[in-house]
């Protein structure tokens, strides 16, 4: 009986030991599972954070890429131009997509009547207009706030004094009837020619007539001579026996041509001004690289054949950016805009076109051309 109890006790002890061992194993397993789960959770959290970081980096990269590829802010401007070989390239600027290339939305308006473009600028219908230095100074003398921002060209023969076959010298102009648009460049050219031989406007019978009408009137025999610019001198030379007496080629630098901005847009949106200046110089590059296409575009706007348009080539000298920048500087001859302006001011008053001289300070701003040269020179 005692032996049976001892055996039973031994069995109970063994069972207890076995249970304890199993409990210990379960706890170890639980701890191991817990540790493994914790490690898994930590790994998952690390992976999630890494994924989120990668996604953030990718988003930043996409944003940077988008910033780099996104077009610059588009500026909307209105530009007026008229019939002159130095301004016809603006039609190329438009048709070649150069305005869009630089970030401009441009309403480009062609004026068959040059004076109408000047008037449109004066009443605030335009942000920019193409004008001669004479007419810009006249506008400023009248109180308009304008700034010259581009030197397009110099007239080197496309402004002409044309006379009938009986007149062969400037001295012979005394007493003759001569038509030109009053107060503008060909009137100015005429006066310079007269003064070169000691004559004045009082020595002739001057008729102030719009350029297109003056050319047609001369061709019909209404005047002895006429002062006209391209393309209108083609009409004047239709008169039998007529010939050029002198031209802007005889007075280098006397007639510079420009893109003129309102003072308001220069002050309030210089970025738009810079874009337009950039567009102009990109256009000059385009003319060199695509001469045939460009010539066809310009001849179409000029309402003439390509052959006739080629006749204007030597009479207008387009300025490179470097040449334009030099013209903005000081000088002691007509290669300097400042010097030429000093010649024009008394003419405007003496001809009765303005009551007072135009203020020169602030009229010329070569900084936009200088910026182009610094970036592309």
Predicted regions and their residues:
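Secondary-structure end/capping motifs
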Residues: 267-353
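Pocket-lining segment of extracytoplasmic ligand-binding domains
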Residues: 127, 134, 206-207, 212-302
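Bacterial N-terminal signal peptides that target proteins for export
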Residues: 1-9
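C-terminal motif of bacterial Sec signal peptides marking the signal peptidase cleavage site
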Residues: 18-21
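Short, glycine-/small- and polar/acidic-enriched structural segments
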Residues: 67-210, 224-230, 246, 253
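N-terminal low-complexity, Pro/Thr/Ser-rich intrinsically disordered segments
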Residues: 44-77
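Conserved C-terminal helix/tail region of periplasmic/extracytoplasmic solute-binding proteins
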Residues: 341-377
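Bacterial lipoprotein signal-peptidase II cleavage site
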Residues: 23-32
């Amino acid at each position: 009986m005692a032996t049976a109890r001892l055996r039973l006790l031994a069995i109970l002890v063994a069972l207890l030991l076995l249970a304890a061992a199993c409990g210990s194993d379960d706890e170890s397993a639980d701890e191991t599972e817990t540790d493994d789960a914790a490690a898994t959770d930590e790994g998952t959290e690390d992976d999630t954070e890494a994924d989120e970081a990668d996604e953030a980096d990718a988003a930043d990269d996409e944003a940077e890429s988008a910033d780099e590829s996104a077009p610059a802010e588009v500026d909307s401007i209105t530009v007026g131009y008229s019939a002159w070989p130095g301004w016809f390239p603006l039609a190329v600027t438009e048709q070649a997509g150069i305005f869009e290339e630089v970030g401009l939305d441009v309403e480009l308006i062609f004026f068959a009547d040059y004076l109408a473009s000047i008037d449109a600028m004066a009443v605030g219908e335009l942000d920019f207009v193409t004008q001669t230095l004479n007419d810009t100074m006249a506008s400023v003398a009248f109180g308009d706030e304008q700034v010259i921002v581009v030197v397009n060209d110099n007239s080197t023969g496309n402004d002409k004094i044309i006379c009938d076959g009986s007149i062969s010298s400037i001295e012979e102009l005394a007493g003759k009837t001569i038509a030109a648009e009053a107060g503008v460049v060909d009137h100015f050219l005429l006066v310079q020619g007269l003064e070169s031989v000691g004559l004045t406007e009082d020595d002739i019978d001057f008729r102030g007539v719009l350029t297109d009408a003056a050319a047609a009137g001369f061709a019909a025999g209404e005047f002895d001579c006429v002062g006209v610019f391209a393309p209108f001198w083609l009409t004047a030379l239709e008169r039998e026996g007529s010939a050029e007496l002198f031209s802007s080629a005889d007075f280098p630098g006397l007639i510079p041509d420009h893109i003129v901005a309102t003072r308001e847009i220069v002050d309030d949106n210089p970025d738009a001004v810079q874009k337009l200046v950039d567009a102009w110089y990109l256009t000059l590059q385009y003319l060199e690289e695509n001469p045939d296409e460009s010539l066809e575009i310009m001849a179409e706007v000029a309402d003439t054949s390509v052959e006739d348009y080629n006749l204007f080539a030597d009479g207008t000298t387009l300025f490179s950016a470097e040449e334009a920048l030099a013209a903005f500087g000081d000088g002691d001859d007509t290669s300097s805009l400042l010097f030429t302006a000093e010649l024009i001011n008394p003419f405007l008053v003496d001809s009765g076109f303005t009551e007072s001289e135009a203020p020169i300070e602030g009229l010329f701003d070569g900084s936009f051309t200088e910026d182009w040269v610094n970036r592309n020179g």
